[in-house]
Amino acid sequence: MALVFAVNAAVCWRLWFADFYGQMGSVEGSFIAISRYLMLHPGDHRWFPMWFCGIPFVRVYQPGLHAAVAALAMALRLSPQRAFHIVAALAYSAGPVALFWLCYKLTKSRGYALATGLAYSLTSPSLLLAADLRRDIGGVTLARRYFLLIGYGDAPHLAGLVLVPLIVWTLHEAVANGRRRFHAAGALLLAALMVVNWTATVGLALAVIAYFFAQARAVPPWRWLAAAGIPVTAYLLVCRWIPPDVLLSIPGNAANSDGTRYDAAHWAQLAALAGMLAVANFVMERARAHPALRFFVSFFLCSGFVVLGRYWFGWSVTPQAHRFQPEMEMALLGALLFPLWRAWDRLPRSVRTGLTAAGILFCGVQLVNYHRFANLLTAPIHVEDTIEYRMAKAFERENPGGRVFAPGSVAIWMNLFTDTPQMVGCCDQSVPNLEQRIAFYTIYSGQNAGARDERYSELWLKAYGASAVGVSGPNSRETYKPFANPAKFEGHMPVLWREGDDAIYRIPGRSGSLAHVIWPAQEVRRAPLHGLDVAPLIAYVEALDDASLPEARLRWIDERRFEVETGLQPGQRVSVQMSYAPGWSATAGGRSAPVHADALGLMVAEPRASGPTRLEFTYDDAAELRLTGWGQLLGLVLLLVQAIGIGGAHAGPALPER
């Protein structure tokens, strides 16, 4: 295991000490920003005001990795980006070690485990299977897993993959070997995985499905039923950070992120996969294949069906199906190297010596190759020279305290460099509602808007409280250049800042406040069907600039309380351009002021007052915390029962290895 870890640590050597490097298109900027926020608000971070017009912190992202980064940074007095890269390097190095451990525990062969761990460390067979992946990275001998980590910022996914083989091992011990105490270990590991990354959690689900098909006939049914308590216990242990409403929103948001549809074709694909697994395991069982081989073949069928189905046929078996490449490579290498291990002792000594020498030479060449590639990806830069930093600082300077709509990679890195709140942010799983997704899609694409592109975009920007918008043109250094029509605001909005092909525009408005007095008829009552269906917005946006309505001043008191001061006439309401969430309440003059969501998902309060009025808004999720607290207590009880191993540590003989 130490050798496998050392090889990977050597590949990513520069990452252990990295600050900033030339991969500003990576989403890691958003992850580091979350850790920075935790460092700045260690006591109370239940509300996160930076993204999507403010959202509960539990909706931002699973907190496990970001909390670990923040804790490391504060303990060692490091910058958040330095701490993040240490954790990322550790995750990269430990993933193959976890695969080594699973292979060893399934076969009791250190040689097979070492070969699989090193192959996973120094090869990427997915590059041979999908031309799009080869074009993305530039060759078949390059470090795809490191490219995912650095180029795309997939650190939470790779951190989760450290846990996936370990959870499969605990499942094997629990159901195949009947060791009940491994239920508790599995629950703890699964709980950790759930608070780290959803993609890796879905990858684990693919592995568990594969394991079930591989062992279904060999394991007594009651053991499978007992194992069902593992995910129940795991979820209860972490439900405080992943409450039920958040859990239920994840599939829909993930599907919306790439257009996955759960239609008849999708269910036909799943049925085909189930049929393949059943046939493959029937054949392997008749051939008396080793349980480890059955598992890895089944795991490859599951993960390969998802990944290669996307690249070969355009299927979306799961949302974001292209992201499960590391899981597929784990499975494929475990399956490919298994026959070599079984035949190894029967090979002539000269052949074994030759294969060993060739393997050592190959590993040496690939180690140098991977190390050079990693150094190229992780070449240090002066972040102050990047457009992401410069535009973020320009937003902070030219639009102090105001909400902004930032383009592409500027939005990703914005809140590592500043505390500027954003209309959008990261990540797809965090989008509070469909209307916000419609809004930023329309602003970026202008699809079918024609000559009214600027007008539609301005309506959406004003409706969601943005006071400045940044645009990256075709010659910008910004990575994604997401605006289909980057010139649409030119001549319609005043320019606050310009550098090369990048500009920040001031969105015209009477007030920079996020609080506004409106009449009930001006509230957005119907959700727009698409980005050009702006009729529901017009009365509301016009009210924002109506000089006959009193202005409202918003001031934050602390992390989850703010006050609004205004003058009201009877029947008037206060619209606050902040995402509504259960837990928000308001008082006016010591009396409760009902708060609800409008059709855009923003807050509206009914003060039922007149004259000078001060409203105090408070986000208090105490009811949810009490409920999830009881859930955690139940989870601890179940964990204790599993740890004690009622009924004995061994409930039956281990399965024979064939």
Question: What function would you assign to each model-found segment?
Answer:
Residues 11, 35-39, 354-432, 531, ...:
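Extracytoplasmic
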Residues 424, 536-655:
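Active-site-proximal, structured, solvent-exposed surfaces of multi-pass membrane proteins
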Residues 231-235, 340-369, 635, 658:
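Signature aromatic-anchored transmembrane alpha helix within multi-pass, membrane-resident enzymes
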Residues 8-170, 174, 192-202, 372-382, ...:
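Active-site lumenal/periplasmic loops and adjacent helix-entry segments of GT-C-fold
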Residues 1-16, 101, 354-358, 634-658:
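Start-transfer (signal-anchor) and selected internal transmembrane alpha helices
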Residues 155-164, 199, 235, 240-241, ...:
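Alpha-helical transmembrane segments at the extracellular/periplasmic loop-to-helix junctions
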Residues 170-191, 221-228:
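Short hydrophobic alpha-helices at membrane interfaces in multi-pass membrane enzymes
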Residues 178-179, 216-228, 278-304, 346-352, ...:
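Membrane-interface helix-loop-helix junctions at transmembrane boundaries of multi-pass membrane enzymes
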